[in-house]
Regions:
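Short, tryptophan-glycine- and acidic/Ser/Thr-enriched carbohydrate-recognition patches
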Residues: 144-156
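N-terminal secretory signal peptides that target proteins for export/translocation
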Residues: 1-4
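C-terminal segment of classical bacterial N-terminal signal peptides
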Residues: 17-25
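Short loop/turn segments that connect beta-strands within beta-propeller blades
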Residues: 211-214, 252-255, 296-300, 336-340, ...
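Short beta-strand-to-coil "C-cap" segments at the C-terminal boundary of structured domains/repeats
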Residues: 133, 497-501
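Repeat-blade elements of multi-bladed beta-propeller folds
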Residues: 62, 138-146, 177-207, 221-249, ...
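A short beta-strand motif characteristic of beta-propeller blades
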Residues: 164-176, 216-222, 257-263, 301-307, ...
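Solvent-exposed beta-strand/loop surfaces, strongest in extracytoplasmic domains of secreted
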Residues: 6-11, 25-141, 159, 167-170
Length: 501
């Protein structure tokens, strides 16, 4: 700025200059310090099991690590297969834990995502695949289910694309192959395959729980008892083992821990597989006449006993309508689930040598040691027909599948002519059916998948050893195949083969 003064008269003009500096902007402040760098992290995810049945509990652990210390914060577990969030858990010493039974059936892709913090960057684990078998895909007793109908409604492998997943040889005492006898029919449940193996050097058997994915032994336990008989059933994440002397023992299916043991009273020869159904284990025993027992799955207490002519060899067949057993001389029984006798189909003879009955629709298919197999009405016990089969028949809602003279035959249950026949006279196993295919084994060691509709061969594979048929009268170990949790499992001597996709 300049000021000017003009001279008046003789005065002199003076110029005054004033320089003002511009003011600093009001928004200018000192810059804040830079934040510390955010450390990188890595997240990994593990599971207590990667092959489970639907509704089974699985524990996941997400571990978050960093070179800069132990991360804090939380991790979210997501099923990337459908985008569902299974939960969020806080890190404790770098690990977040999730326990869930909410996995849907199928192969699920689980992802753990760490959200990060002020000091640690977010990160996600690689997807972890968990195979979840649909409920109902378990094989829980002889011939798959409590009706013994050989039918697996869910969990069937693709019969046209079967390959051998594993083959294991199972031994006698202490896992040694010394004394190894025959392998029993398998029970398939909760990501495991359960079998018993006869010990030919001593009395008793061994119970094995195998990883269904690999065939590796998860746990095993010796089952004492007279002779080499034992048999299994499964329900409620519990495996039930019965020995020849009538000792019924419950084990945790996941750990092998013994939960309880009950000595069944009054009889001394137990030669039929148990059947577990809706919280109760049903057992047939012989010696002094015979009994059918109902035992609580929760505590092993005997709930009731039903008297029969002879209690050997016939595994109880059970559904909502009652408990059915079939003995020699066509001595067949139906008990209510509460233990009262509903009917007794009898003939003029008595004797031992029963065989496992099969339930399908409104009928009971009964077999004795030396009798013509008979078809009885479930409601009344009256005879409605006969059938021919060397083994327990299987059903799929369309056909009855039998083994007749070493061939697999599809029978129209209404009595029409046979629909088809397959085989060369060497087929020996009780058939099982699932996913539109009938599976059967040959004494040559071959296993076949046959179209249920046409009888045409879909697939054939080798079990690796001789396959035996079920000798319900003479053998200590009852053998048979099973389908469950996406596997076809086949005993062959002292080995067990599993086929899948």
């Amino acid at each position: 700025m300049r000021w000017y003064v003009r001279a008046l008269g003789g005065c002199v003009a003076v110029a005054v200059g004033l320089l003002l500096s511009p003011a600093s902007p009001a928004s200018a402040h000192p810059k804040p310090p830079k934040p510390p760098p955010v450390a990188t992290t890595s997240t990994t995810l593990t599971a207590s099991a990667t092959s489970v049945a639907q509704d089974s509990w699985v524990t996941f652990k997400a571990q978050v690590t960093s070179n800069a210390g132990t991360p804090a914060g939380s991790v979210t577990l997501t099923d990337a297969s459908d985008g569902s969030i299974l939960g969020t858990s806080a890190l404790v010493s770098g690990t977040a834990t999730f326990t869930t039974a909410a996995l849907a059936p199928g192969t699920r892709q689980l992802v753990a995502s760490y959200g990060g913090s002020t000091s640690f960057a977010p990160s996600s684990a690689a997807a972890l695949a968990v195979s979840v078998a649909q409920t109902g895909s378990d094989a829980v007793t002889y011939q798959i289910d409590p009706s013994h109908d050989g039918r697996q409604a869910f969990g069937a492998p693709d019969a046209s694309a079967l390959t051998q997943k594993w083959n294991v040889t199972l031994g006698g005492t202490g896992g040694s192959l010394a004394g190894a006898g025959d392998v029993s029919y398998p029970v398939i449940a909760g990501g495991r395959v359960f079998v018993t193996v006869e010990n030919t050097q001593t009395y008793g058997t061994n119970l094995f729980a195998l990883d269904a994915s690999t065939g590796a032994t998860d746990w095993s336990v010796g089952l004492a008892g007279t002779y080499g008989f034992s048999a299994l059933a499964y329900d409620g994440q519990t495996i039930f083992a019965l020995n020849y002397d009538g000792l019924l023992t419950a084990f945790s299916a996941s750990t092998g821990q013994e939960l309880w043991a009950t000595q069944l009273p009054d009889q001394w020869a137990f030669t039929a597989p148990p059947t577990a159904y809706d919280g109760v284990v049903y057992v047939s025993g012989a010696g002094y006449g015979g009994y059918v027992y109902a035992v609580s799955e929760a505590d092993g207490l005997v709930q009731w006993e039903g008297t029969v002519e002879n209690g050997d060899k016939s595994s109880p067949a059970v559904d909502d309508s009652g408990v059915y057993v079939s003995y020699a001389c066509q001595q067949d029984y139906r008990f209510s689930l509460s233990g009262s006798l509903v009917w007794h189909h009898t003939t003029s003879c008595e004797g031992g040598g029963g065989s496992t009955a099969v339930l399908d629709g409104g009928n009971v298919y009964g077999r004795g040691a030396h009798d013509t197999p008979v078809i009885l009405s479930k409601s009344s016990g009256t005879t409605v027909g006969t059938f021919a089969s060397q083994t327990a028949p299987a059903f799929d809602g369309n056909n009855m599948y039998t083994i007749d003279n070493g061939n697999l035959v599809a029978v129209d249950p209404s009595g029409s002519p046979d629909r088809w026949s397959f085989g060369d006279g060497t087929l020996v196993t009780a058939p099982v059916v699932s996913g539109g295919a009938v599976f059967v084994g040959s004494s040559t060691g071959m296993v076949y998948a046959v179209s249920a509709a046409t009888g045409q061969q879909i697939w054939a594979g080798a079990a690796g050893s001789v396959i035996m048929g079920p000798d319900e009268q003479n053998a200590d170990v009852l053998v048979g195949m099973a389908v469950g949790d996406g596997l076809l499992v086949v005993p062959a001597g002292n080995a067990l083969a599993a086929f899948g996709n």
